[in-house]
Amino acid sequence: MSMSVQGAIAANRFGLGAKPGEIEAASVNPRTWLKQQLQAIEFNDGLASSSELEIALAEYQRDRKRAKKMADVKNPSVQFGKSAQKMSIAVAKRAIDSNVSLSWRLLDFFSNHFSVSSSGRTMVALAPTLEREAIAPNLDQRFEQMLLSVVRHPAMLIYLNNERSFGPNSLAGKRGRGLNENLAREI
């Protein structure tokens, strides 16, 4: 098989960098090769969902308060950080080893577009789930669908402080706690 400039461009510019044999494969028909790259991204099934992580975070906060009362010197936040780091490494390895690097490149692009800060335990845990639960499943959908999925995701709601936002006609809204405009500014 021979290599072409178009094949090299397809494999390098639209993916995560060519792996051995990819330039040759893309050179046969670069457009077809790129279209074949647009497949659903598979994540490790063992990764926790945002719902599971929210429960774990609540339990962590409860245990932390108990430990403080009992003057326990263990630091559970160290273990929490290690789990988040392991999850990031696992996702990066999966992207590198994948045969659909264009899909991973698009995921990276939209993850940067809809970025959330991962400061604080809650966001360290939830930020990666935004990618898996709201962005990746919508890569082949209309942008509007992805946007709606992202803005309704717990990580984005917490990042923009919208989990504390109330409608103007709700009981909380009538007490002066109304809508949070952070989301509107971001969009």
Can you say where each PLM-predicted feature lies in the sequence?
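A contiguous strand-loop segment
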Residues: 1-187
